[in-house]
Amino acid sequence: MAEMMGGITGWFVADKIVAYLFIVLFIWGASNKFGKKGEFNDDFTSLDNMKSLQGFAALGVILHHISQEYFFQEEGVLSLFVNAGAYFVALFFFCSGYGLIKSLDTKKDYLKGFIGKRVVKSLVIPFYVNVILYGLMMFIVKWPLEPLQWVTNFLGITMMNRYAWFPIVLAILYVVFYLHFSNIKNRKICFVAIGIFIICLGIHTCICGHVAWWAGPDNWWMDDNFWETDFKWWMDEQIFWFNGEWWANSAPAFLTGLIFANYEKKIVAFFKKKYALKLHILIVITLLLGMLNNYGQAEFGYWTEWEGNGPAIGDKIVTYFTQIPLLFVFPLLVFVIMMKYHVSNPVSRFFGKYSLHTYLMNLAAITMCRFIEVPDALVMVGDVKNNLFIFAIAVIVLSVLLGMLEHKITTAVQNLIYRKPAPVAVATYVRPSLLEADGEHTTKTSLAAEIKSDDVADKKAEEKKDRS
């Protein structure tokens, strides 16, 4: 027994407890139709449930970013979330694609003013508000940036916040959606064209790699001497757009959302017949695609620059193509499950409301809290693992607070730019119909009729008197 328990530490248990608590969130406020034959959740794609799902995804992304910190990986804490980021982001992309088609089908002239409302107001303004906030924080703490980098960061050409890639990619996909659906009537052609664009976007990230591999001699990023003598700031990791596979590897889910929304009735009707059998088949397919993805990651991989064979773009592209099917199908599996089981609780709704902003401010929170994480820092809370626990809690809380602040600032900027002109008051008289007349109006008109009748009678009496 002692030997069996020898590998189990307090932090092993704590790690599992964190995973358990995250799972508990999927039970609290659940609507469960499993075990009830022929019964389904008719509201599984409602706005409230979509927002709750995005809330879970936002919290998952925060935990994913925390789990990727060096000491967390060393200690194996939050290991469940290390490679889960792409799945959480895929849910965001799916919901975005789904919402576009539903809005297109239900809102009159939806594409009129689309770029201004859905791209500039909803994505570009939040992005640049975030750029300014990060710039102010970097200026306050005297973050060492080259003068040119300050300029390119504020312009958005290079990344002030390396986590802020999502609104950029989503804005690009929105523009692509608008260009296709405003000019092409055949939706199938639109879906195919958007799918091709998404694949090309992923290939482009594979070509870009993680560093400016094209800017120096072969494998310069592995040469310590080059870093000390010839390295320029713009050659570093994640400086330019698309420096990283995460920019596009989850984007196929956007296409899934478009297609699901367009054929929702047919898809739902299909899965309602023999639901249990089809759900299990879909689960098996997803697991097989997961194995294909794992094979691609293990045999080829995205981080090929550090194998000493140059950027190895071909290996990246192969890895990308082994991942596309999984991230296309995974959101479908989630929503087929939601036909029978979905969750909405205060935590999920809260994170759903602030999902974009907690995500955008997450890097700032992580950076501010790193003094807790590093064991040889001046400020010590306890041993390394105690520090990691406090670090994780602090990052979540600070991400929420900073996200709420950014949301408030962004909303104020949006209202300032897009405020509607005050309505001009025009005094007009509208003659109500008899059916619209209320009691007061009826009384007034009756009284006026009586006064007018009396006046006519008096006038006739006076005329009669004059004649006589």
Would you name each region that the model predicts?
Residues 1-203, 208-209, 216-223, 354, ...:
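Membrane-cytosol interface segments of multi-pass membrane proteins
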